[in-house]
């Protein structure tokens, strides 16, 4: 059907409710808007659904959510694991509770029990819940740190990680096979509860989750000793982190935790924020104001679904607060865990740290220093979760920590996704340890630069919206793949990795080897002296990202090098 035919189908079919029809009637004469809403189905990709909330096939609404859930249900039934049930969580966004309820009732209508949280919860707690309940799958209704007009739907599998190949592709096939909305099943909540197929969960899972987090503390005595001396400012950015973060810090004994009042409670409009992303310095405006007022040691922000953590720490020499990238905060926690586990004799046999190919190269000297195996996986925390499962199945290694550059990490194996609640807890322990030794987190970071090298990373993003955007992004990748640059400025490309074609080319000798990772549309350029550049189209947005990293002789030298590399990459493009 053409997009106008699709519009008329939605307007005239009794399946769609009047509220949906009224929304469409209001835009029916705006052809560009009609086209954008109906020119395609909202794509159920490897990460699930993500899109603008509204009526239409290319929007997040009860009908697209129901259809996605029917596809998931069909796949679960084909595998014969429907008796295990599915756990469901949701964030603070508009329509998140409604979409979660819609998914639960669709599952119930297919004979699959839904365990749905009573109110909003962090994404990592969903990962923990489905493992604890022994579910076959999990759903989180969230659009993470996207603007308020968005929502999304992520699917997790029985190990607690987001679905990976081949399961992700098989679920996509099932969703795409549904051509008629009328074939999608649903039932009332009342009937689902009577049938024992709709169960609300909450406190019991919360308590178990908290107990599991506390197992990651290495020096509880240090926290007790410094609990009255350290000042923490925290903002949940109007999302799910408020209650769990406050609870864990309170139960550990931290006495001075100041929560940003304007961003404390859930707000689907994110009124005080341009963009609820802890990677964005503007997200810290209110928190930094409070930090200066309270003379805080550390300033923390979790994103709306509490899987990413942003950090500022005080530089006592200047009195200013320094922003930490995800690489920096991840390295602080990694160094602390590896150093203290080694010192206390609690490092497991065959320890491994798992990271992604676009994360800082500082992971290499740190893991070498402590005799820990470094394993690199494709971008996306689900691949770190997949490694934990592999370790458990084979006994090859013991997981000690995992991190990615995009402000996500995981200490422990209680969840299989990045967990900002455990990250807050770990970082506050590190801050307490530093305070005991008359240091700040920034002092510790500087000492790590002096020990391992001045590593610095950045990103350059090209956004291409609309129908032509995907084509233009494909053309850029095609050009780089077929004619890889010999150099970026004065940095020669030493090795070129094409993950889609599973080949690594030594640019000098021409020798070819394999990447050793699953196929993915990613290009990686190895440059001299720990410099690198990686090109990767986003899986959820009309963007192509260029990740870059360098190693300098000082903080200033590293900054200058990364700025020059960014300009050289732009020149090649």
Can you annotate each of these PLM segments?
Residues 156-186, 327-351, 355-366, 420, ...:
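Glycine-rich phosphate-binding loop plus the immediately following alpha-helix
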Residues 99-107, 150-157, 307-327, 363:
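Short Gly/Thr/Asp-enriched flexible loops that form oxyanion-binding sites at enzyme active sites
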Residues 33-38, 42, 151-285, 291:
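Gly/Ser/Thr-enriched, mixed-charge loops and adjacent short helices
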Residues 5-103, 192-229, 240:
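An N-terminal, well-structured beta->alpha segment
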Residues 85-91, 231-234, 410, 549:
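Short glycine-rich or small-residue beta-strand-to-loop segments that form or flank ligand, phosphate
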Residues 292, 296-298, 320-322, 340-536, ...:
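Phosphate-binding and adjacent anionic-ligand microenvironments
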Residues 87-150, 255-310:
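N-terminal small/polar loop signature for handling phosphorylated ligands or for N-terminal nucleophile
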Residues 38-58, 143-144, 232, 236-248, ...:
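Conserved phosphate/anionic-ligand binding catalytic regions in large, soluble enzymes, centered on
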């Amino acid at each position: 059907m053409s997009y106008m035919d699709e519009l008329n189908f939605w307007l005239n079919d009794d399946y769609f409710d009047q509220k949906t029809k009224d929304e469409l009637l209001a835009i029916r004469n705006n052809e560009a808007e009609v086209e954008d809403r109906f020119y395609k189905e909202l794509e159920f990709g490897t990460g699930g659904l993500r899109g603008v909330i509204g009526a239409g096939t290319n929007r997040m609404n009860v009908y697209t959510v129901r259809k996605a859930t029917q596809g998931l249900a069909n796949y679960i039934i084909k595998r014969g694991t429907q008796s295990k049930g599915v756990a469901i969580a949701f964030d603070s966004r508009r329509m998140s509770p409604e979409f979660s309820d819609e998914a639960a009732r669709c599952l119930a209508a297919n004979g699959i029990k839904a365990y749905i949280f009573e109110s909003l919860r962090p994404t990592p707690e969903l990962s923990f819940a489905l493992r604890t309940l022994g579910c076959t799958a999990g759903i989180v209704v969230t659009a993470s740190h996207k603007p308020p007009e968005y929502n999304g739907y992520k699917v997790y599998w029985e190990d607690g990680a987001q679905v990976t190949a081949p399961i992700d592709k098989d679920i996509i096939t099932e969703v795409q096979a549904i051509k008629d909305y009328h074939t999608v099943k649903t039932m009332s909540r009342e009937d689902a509860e009577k049938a024992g197929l709709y169960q609300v969960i909450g406190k019991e899972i919360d308590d178990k989750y908290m107990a599991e987090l506390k197992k990651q503390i290495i020096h509880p005595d240090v926290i007790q000793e410094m609990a009255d001396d350290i000042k923490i400012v925290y903002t949940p950015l109007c999302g799910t982190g408020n209650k769990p973060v406050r609870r864990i810090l309170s139960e550990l004994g931290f006495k001075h935790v100041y929560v940003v009042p304007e961003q404390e409670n859930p707000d689907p409009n994110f009124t005080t924020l341009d963009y609820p992303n802890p990677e964005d310095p503007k997200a810290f405006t209110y928190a930094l104001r409070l930090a200066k007022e309270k003379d805080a040691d550390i300033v923390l922000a979790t994103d709306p679904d509490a899987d990413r953590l942003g950090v500022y720490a005080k530089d006592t020499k200047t009195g200013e607060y320094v922003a930490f990238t995800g690489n920096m905060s991840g390295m602080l926690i990694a160094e602390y865990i590896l150093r203290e586990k080694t010192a206390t004799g609690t490092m497991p046999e065959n320890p491994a740290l798992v990271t992604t190919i676009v994360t800082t190269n500082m992971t290499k000297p740190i893991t070498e220093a402590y005799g820990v195996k470094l394993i690199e996986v494709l971008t996306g925390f689900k691949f770190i979760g997949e490694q934990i499962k592999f370790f458990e199945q084979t006994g090859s290694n013991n997981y000690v920590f995992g991190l990615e550059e995009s402000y996500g990490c995981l200490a422990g194996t209680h969840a299989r996704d990045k967990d900002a609640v455990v990250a807050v807890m770990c970082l506050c322990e590190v801050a307490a340890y530093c305070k005991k030794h008359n240091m700040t987190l920034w002092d510790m970071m500087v000492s790590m630069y002096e020990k391992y090298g001045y590593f610095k990373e950045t990103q350059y993003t090209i956004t291409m919206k609309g129908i032509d955007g995907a084509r233009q992004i494909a053309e850029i990748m095609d050009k780089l793949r077929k004619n890889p640059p010999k150099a970026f400025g004065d940095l020669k490309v030493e090795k070129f990795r094409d993950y889609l074609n599973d080949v690594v080319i030594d640019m000098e000798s021409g020798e070819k080897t394999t990447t050793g990772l699953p196929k993915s549309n990613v290009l990686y350029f190895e440059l001299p002296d720990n410099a690198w550049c990686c090109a990767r189209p986003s899986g959820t947005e009309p963007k192509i990202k260029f990740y870059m990293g360098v190693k300098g002789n000082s903080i200033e030298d590293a900054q200058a090098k990364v700025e020059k590399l960014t300009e050289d990459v732009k020149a090649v493009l």
